[in-house]
Amino acid sequence: MAYPVIEAPYGLKPVNLIGGQVFAGSTRMYNIQYGYATDIFYGDFVVLSRGNVTRASVSTGTGLNQTVGIFLGCTFTSPVTKQKQFSQYWPASTTAGDCQAYVLDDPDTMFKAVVCSATTVVASAAMAMIGTNMSAINNTGSTATGNSANAVLAPTATAATTTLPLRLVGLVQESAISVSATGSSSSTTITLTGTGLPSAIPIGTDVAYIAANGQIIQTGSFVTAAAAAAATSVTINAAIAVPGSIVAIPSASTIVFTQYPEVLVKFNQALHGYYSATGA
């Protein structure tokens, strides 16, 4: 069975813990204040305000009120039916005084997330981004599904700043999509021959090529501008860097472009409130 095509972001989904720790999927329950007027979706960042959970818009990771974790649903007594209700999301302005949010608050959690170039436009991460810091995109989730639409921002260069909220730990191989074309590179430009790209590729697409012995060579470079199907020129973030002082893809090489729409990330230490000496 083929892995589903990734069509839109879904917030942060917990998958395991770093360092081989046992992941139980446990959550901590926090209060949501009566009438809180902002939707909170499954997979959203949340912070604490006077002991209550509120939705956080996290892009740079700066500020004193750091995240307490990721929202994973809630329970409350419906003001309409007077029955206990379990909900994928918190509906804004619900007049329930007993709401409890399920929050995954372990700062060592690794999450799966979708990479986007802007808002909800699915893009790609690349091998060169592993270990770097990533920004987040704040999107409004869906009241139909209850799921978040937050995403990881595809960079046009490897990030050097330490103020970004997420650290990219790995690429999700199962949803990767690869295409190939014949060509070469010079500095930050790949020139393709023949009919060019067989299909469009987004920002962040990983670049590799096939060696004479049939092995794949990772270049350490990635695409910085989306390229359409049949394009014969592709812009990359930097000249390739291959052992042996190789800085260009040889002429008539098979160049492999791999899109990784999903990544594994964790909170940067400065983002999570448990690692901060300043309380909420």
Describe each region flagged by the PLM.
Residues 182-195, 226-235:
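Ser/Thr- and Asn-enriched, surface-exposed coil loops between beta-strands
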Residues 1-182, 206-221, 235-280:
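Surface-exposed, low-hydrophobicity beta-strand/loop segments enriched in small/polar/acidic residues
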Residues 197-200:
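Disulfide-braced loops of extracellular cysteine-rich modules
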